[in-house]
């Protein structure tokens, strides 16, 4: 008997916004999604703030979204967990952080990370807490290596953050900026080692662009037409010498909490086996605020991983179901590692399909990305009649939305519409069913209605939730859902009991 697959199609960064201006989704031609919405029940679900375990009003992101979707419960995110520990005071007695501070008394403390309150990869409040702790512990030499954002924040907001941290350091009485690098270099995740090398050279070798202050470095970049994301790695100088390069035995605290864009620069700084580029042979006391990758050695983890039992993937495997996880490079970790609750190993019966993302500087240059190739390969896999459950992510609305180009984002959305149409036709033909949704908003909110400025960050808008399949044509959906209700809905569609760890609910009205 042919399998009747249940598919979960995640249109990354595809939110709902009633305003049309600056809304690449509303401005796109989406005949397939329009038709599907007419034929099948659909609603909106929440994908930000408290609904996904983030602080109230905090925009969602892909890591958080996929973790909540796969877990079937609200997962309290590292941002919330760490911020709470600062408020409670536990942060300042954290064993690993204390050890780093003790080591730095004889040496120096380098604090590196994304200078942002975007809350996606890091939070500026965590940096301030580390500086305060250093002062309280008697550390004299504290150097900040700032990575500038411009993706999860306004494209030219780095000066504000730099001033805020400078004011904080002045008030606390310790700390100075040593280097500044755009996240494009310091936080690459696509093995573009030549980018990472520039950030490494600035921090360790004191080689790169030069400036007398972080403000000067940022302003030079703006004058050169480069926004925060693309600030060239720059060494801050004092008396013709770098303010503070990383030296043997220094302590380093990397205050990013999201792993994917923290891994490469960490590997460059700590791994003995490394072939990305030539490095200095130095050993340091290196702290990752959270676990970036279990395979990275020579690091200390300040906030270890939370374990999630019975995620959707694990539970389906226990029930003997086969599954396919499909995405292009940019979102591959999201449909595997994050969807599985931070577990790298595939479940029994879980196959993975990775399509390389195109090698372009920014995705507005190729808004189709690898969606067509991904769709063709996924259609082949559907034809194999071997999968009970399929998760597929289209990266386009998010990755192109981040570029700020509405024109390119429209192409991205229209590409996804075409691809979703093909997949749904095939799934329905097989007698299967599907949920079409998103992990967070982005492409629907690309202009600030008040200032008219380009927005490159995610949004706090709800996302679509469409249930497709012959037996659901006249079904009713519950309102007020959230991402953690998706897994229980899928189990409902697969006629499986929900495990007790899942606190979400099926959104199909009984």
UniProtKB/Swiss-Prot annotation:
This is 2,3-bisphosphoglycerate-independent phosphoglycerate mutase. The lineage of its organism: Bacteria, Bacillati, Bacillota, Clostridia, Peptostreptococcales. Mn(2+) 1 binds at residues 398, 402, 458. GO terms for molecular function: manganese ion binding; phosphoglycerate mutase activity. Binds 2 manganese ions per subunit. Substrate binds at residues 121, 151-152, 183, 189, 258-261, 331. GO terms for cellular component: cytosol. Monomer. The keyword Cytoplasm does not apply. Its EC number is 5.4.2.12. Its cofactor is Mn(2+). The active site is at residue 62. GO terms for biological process: glucose catabolic process; glycolytic process. Catalyzes the interconversion of 2-phosphoglycerate and 3-phosphoglycerate.
